[in-house]
Amino acid sequence: MQRLIPIAFSSSVKGFVRRHYLLLERGNNPETSLSRSFSGASHHHHYRERLRNELHCIKFDDAFSLFCEMLQSRPIPSIVDFTRVLTVIAKMNKFDIVIYLYHKMENLGISHDLYSFTILIHCFCRCSRLSLALALLGKMMKLGFRPSIVTLGSLLNGFCQGNRFQEAVSLVDSMDGFGFVPNVVIYNTVINGLCKNRDLNNALEVFYCMEKKGIRADAVTYNTLISGLSNSGRWTDAARLLRDMVKRKIDPNVIFFTALIDTFVKEGNLLEARNLYKEMIRRSVVPNVFTYNSLINGFCIHGCLGDAKYMFDLMVSKGCFPDVVTYNTLITGFCKSKRVEDGMKLFCEMTYQGLVGDAFTYNTLIHGYCQAGKLNVAQKVFNRMVDCGVSPDIVTYNILLDCLCNNGKIEKALVMVEDLQKSEMDVDIITYNIIIQGLCRTDKLKEAWCLFRSLTRKGVKPDAIAYITMISGLCRKGLQREADKLCRRMKEDGFMPSERIYDETLRDHYTSLSAELIKAAHE
């Protein structure tokens, strides 16, 4: 009988199995309970029927029940039938469960075949248990099984996911010994892993190695390398590969162009991004919504709203319909440039087109109107948000609270915070900082101090801003001793103000102890 290596199973796997078997014992699975009363032949027929009719749409619990039913069948089903069920469970990403079930099979003396070993190795790799996968590979080879290209591919993916690239490259080099010639997919797996790990020199070395062996790189190879090089600012190398790609008549597709445009945008290289867009059009590659969103986002980030709006209009004229991300990007750009009315026009257009704004959309507009000093309009946008069924989040309330406090409406802000505390929403330190600052600004130091002292009781830990705000408030009132105590407590909690915060907040009010602590923090 084949014996697999001993495995320690996680508590979650043990818990699931325990609960499942309890249900079976209590008879909560009528299908399984009914099957127990059948004869062996009837039971055999029942699971075979389920294998034939249910596997294509089976749910996880049902697949697990089917496996248990098969274990009880006599004669015991073949390894092929067991593997069919376990393949389905593995596709549900229940890798620990698959490993557990294989050991249940082993305990019944069911011998594994190449395919079942391969699935088990795949599951070990996906669970980041590479040492067990390698031990199992050795075990199966001792039993006379020769690994397939799928087996080796699973190991290769496992090495790359575990950042064990030397072993990945060694595995590729040794594939000839197993009778397999690594193809472009195998090399792409290694190159992709190296690029994600920013090990670009080794990625290029693997690329040149595959070229020497006569394996032609494809669009995926070039896309991975060029994106990785561009993300690391190696524009010369990226451009050289791009020229090489074009020379070989490997046509870049929309995904390739979009990824590269997005990289240039993130690097702030808008000229190259725009040129790539023109190259797409020249090559008759049709840009998609992601392409336009990347370009519009880049123009908005760098304050080129005219270019962003032009690209938006061009997008529409070419029959590519903007999505919520497109509108949110433009609305944010307009609001940051203090053109909130233009942002609102876009919001109305978006609604007219049948798109529903999300919390981000409304938060952007509310913030824009608050910054413009139009609290009443911000309140109307908030009301519309609620009426449209979009739930305000803590960011929404923080924006409104900040606006109320900045406009001297501290009483309204306090009522809103009280309502928030009664709701199920988690009130964060940012919320309390806004209120504490508002109270200090309106000479309500006593109320601010009470709120500050209650934070720990509310399960919220004060941060540096909370401390600085209170120390500044105490200093302005001439309460030097209390300020010194709080400064000492701030240091004990591991917070020290930056030089900028000190300059802006404490310089005019510092006490001797405050000055000493701050000086020590920056030596």
Curated annotation (Swiss-Prot):
The keyword Repeat applies. Keywords: Repeat. The keyword Repeat applies. PROSITE patterns: PPR. Gene3D superfamilies: Tetratricopeptide repeat domain. InterPro entries: Pentatricopeptide_rpt, PPR-containing_protein, TPR-like_helical_dom_sf. PPR repeats lie at residues 43-77, 78-112, 113-147, 148-182, 183-217, 218-252, 253-287, 288-322, 323-357, 358-392, 393-427, 428-462, 463-497. Belongs to the PPR family. P subfamily. This is Pentatricopeptide repeat-containing protein At1g64580. It comes from Arabidopsis thaliana (Mouse-ear cress).
